[in-house]
């Protein structure tokens, strides 16, 4: 007995131990745990609770499957997905007969229109290319379909009777059409079900939503021909117009567009339809295109200072002020005449005292007595015109002989124009006065320009070249950055007269007179060994 009962006792003790452990572990579920196996297994383990608790899968599986109440709605939603399809609480939109970019008579596109753009087809400027065609199709008097019903535009309710009085079929519409186009179907597909749609009779109509035919045609077809609207042709003047003429009284938040100021011309056009009257800018007219262009009146000296850093363009005197002419040719003449008049004050303000005397005397000898200067010549003048330009092939560097207004400094002897004052003074020394104040220290060769001396000094090994004066009675303080001043006023007056007659007698002699020196020559002449 003891040996046979011992395993049972041990087994019972083990089971009781597990039972106590399970009761301590489950804690709050001690009352609930025996109830579920009793219902599922009524005949096997109800009589012996230890044997019932000893069946571990039978006890622990129902206990473990007991979950908190928060997970129960998840199981409920998973089972109801395929069993209970339902409509959304918001009434769905009905299918309209058109979309934004399609004509109103198209029955194929059934995409509902965005309620933000409802009622825009009646405004001027929107779909203006189709207005002439649609005006005959959408005639309110011959329209058998339900009337145009713009939705979601909240405005005065006083317009509702005028909309409902246009036709007797308003009560037959079960759902609204969000486009102003007539709905091709009396009832939509989704309206067959018992779903509550909004009643279009309770909707308000905007003040700009074309309640009548006259309002519809006067806004967008006021400038079109009546024949074009009847025949269905598209007017190009309406298509070209890119401006939107939205009324600011729309309550749906649409912005009121205005004309762009960038497209306005000088005469302030009201619209771009009359684009044929737009004038070109004054700088782009035919005369200026053939001539110097936009920057012709602005030279390089306007943006850079001279070495002397003086005011290059003084204020004009009262006699030099003239009324501005509208023609560009006269404007250029005025500029060139001002340049010739302003040579004297520019030379006076920017040069030294000796340079002032040289320029004044040369100009006076040129303007006061051009004919006597010719009569003083020893050989006699052959040409009647005194100021003759120098040959174009005189210099290696290309110099324009045209009357460029940007070149404000003019030579009085040869009418050559320069952009900078130092260029004009260098021109006087090298060509007209034949001054050579720069002498090489090695070979003793003299030059009229310092850059020519520096170029020549590279040929010598030592490179020694100093600046020496050619004339004895010259004050050393007269040197200004390598520029030598002439000795006296009388000599400069004689220089101007003699050189003026030389230039008038032999026009081609200017290049031969200055060819011995390397002043301003091309690269081929500057590479000479002598």
From Swiss-Prot:
Lineage of source species: Eukaryota, Fungi, Dikarya, Ascomycota, Pezizomycotina
Protein origin, superkingdom: Eukaryota
SUPFAM superfamilies: beta-beta-alpha zinc fingers
Localization: Nucleus; Cytoplasm
Gene transcribed to yield this protein: MSN2
GO CC annotations, alphabetized: nucleus
InterPro entries assigned to the protein according to its UniProt record, in alphabetical order: Znf_C2H2_sf, Znf_C2H2_type
Zinc finger (C2H2-type): 409-437, 438-465
Function as written in the Swiss-Prot or TrEMBL entry: Transcription factor that acts as a key downstream transcription factor in the HOG1-MAPK pathway. Plays crucial roles in the regulation of dimorphism transition, aggravated pigmentation, conidiation, microsclerotia formation and subsequent virulence towards Spodoptera litura larvae. More specifically regulates the expression of genes involved in antioxidation, pigment biosynthesis and ion transport and storage.
GO MF annotations, alphabetized: DNA-binding transcription factor activity, RNA polymerase II-specific; RNA polymerase II transcription regulatory region sequence-specific DNA binding; zinc ion binding
Knocked-out gene: effects: Increases the yeast-to-hypha transition rate, enhances conidiation capacity and aggravates pigmentation. Leads to sensitivity to stress. Significantly reduces microsclerotia formation and decreases virulence levels.
UniProt xrefs under SMART domains: ZnF_C2H2 (SM00355)
Keywords noted in UniProt: Cytoplasm, Metal-binding, Nucleus, Repeat, Transcription, Transcription regulation, Virulence, Zinc, Zinc-finger
Record PROSITE patterns: ZINC_FINGER_C2H2_1, ZINC_FINGER_C2H2_2
Name listed for the protein in its UniProt record: C2H2-type transcription factor MSN2
């Amino acid at each position: 007995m003891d040996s046979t009962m011992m395993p049972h006792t041990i087994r019972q003790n083990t089971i009781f131990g597990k039972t106590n452990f399970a009761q301590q572990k489950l804690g709050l579920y001690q009352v609930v745990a025996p109830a579920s196996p009793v219902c599922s297994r009524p005949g096997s383990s109800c009589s012996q609770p230890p044997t019932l608790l000893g069946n571990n899968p039978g006890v622990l599986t129902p206990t473990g499957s007991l979950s908190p109440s928060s997970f129960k709605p998840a199981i409920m939603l998973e089972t109801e997905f395929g069993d209970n399809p339902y409509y959304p609480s918001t009434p769905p939109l009905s299918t309209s007969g058109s979309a934004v970019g399609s004509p109103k008579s198209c029955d194929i596109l059934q995409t509902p229109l965005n309620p933000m753009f409802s009622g825009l087809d009646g405004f001027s400027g929107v779909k203006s290319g189709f207005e002439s065609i649609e005006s005959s199709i959408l005639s309110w008097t011959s329209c058998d379909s339900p009337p145009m019903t713009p939705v979601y535009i909240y405005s005065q309710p006083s317009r509702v009777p005028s909309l409902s009085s246009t036709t007797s079929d308003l009560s037959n519409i079960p759902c609204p059409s969000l486009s102003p186009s007539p709905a091709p179907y009396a009832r939509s597909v989704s309206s067959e079900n018992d779903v509550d749609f909004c009643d279009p009779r309770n909707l308000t109509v905007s003040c700009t939503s074309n309640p009548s035919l006259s309002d519809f045609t006067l806004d967008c077809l006021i400038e079109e021909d009546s024949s074009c609207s009847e025949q269905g042709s598209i007017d190009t003047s309406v298509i070209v117009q890119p401006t939107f003429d939205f009324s600011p009284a729309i309550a749906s938040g649409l912005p009121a567009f205005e004309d762009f100021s960038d497209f306005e011309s000088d005469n302030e056009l009201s619209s771009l339809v009359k684009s044929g009257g737009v004038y070109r800018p004054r700088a782009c007219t035919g005369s200026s295109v053939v001539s110097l262009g936009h920057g012709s009146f602005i030279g390089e000296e306007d943006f850079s200072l001279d070495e002397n850093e003086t005011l290059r363009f003084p204020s004009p005197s009262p006699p030099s002020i003239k009324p501005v002419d509208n023609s560009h040719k006269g404007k250029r003449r005025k500029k060139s005449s001002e340049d010739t008049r302003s040579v004297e004050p520019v030379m006076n303000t920017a040069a030294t005292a000796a340079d002032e005397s040289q320029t004044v005397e040369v100009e006076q000898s040129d303007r006061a007595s051009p004919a006597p200067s010719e009569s003083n010549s020893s050989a006699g003048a052959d040409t009647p015109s005194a100021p003759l330009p120098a040959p174009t092939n005189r210099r290696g560097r290309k110099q324009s002989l045209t009357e460029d207004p940007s070149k404000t400094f003019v030579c009085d002897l040869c009418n050559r124009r320069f952009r900078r004052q130092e260029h004009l003074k260098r021109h006087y020394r090298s060509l007209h006065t034949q001054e050579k104040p720069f002498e090489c220290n090695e070979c003793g060769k003299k030059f009229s320009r310092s850059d020519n001396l520096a170029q020549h000094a590279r040929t010598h090994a030592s490179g020694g070249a100093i600046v020496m004066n050619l004339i004895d009675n010259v004050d050393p303080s007269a040197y200004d950055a390598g520029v030598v001043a002439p000795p006296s006023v009388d000599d400069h007056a004689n220089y101007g007269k003699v050189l003026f007659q030389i230039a008038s007698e032999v026009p081609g002699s200017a290049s031969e007179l200055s060819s011995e020196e390397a002043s301003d020559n091309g690269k081929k002449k500057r590479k000479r060994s002598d």
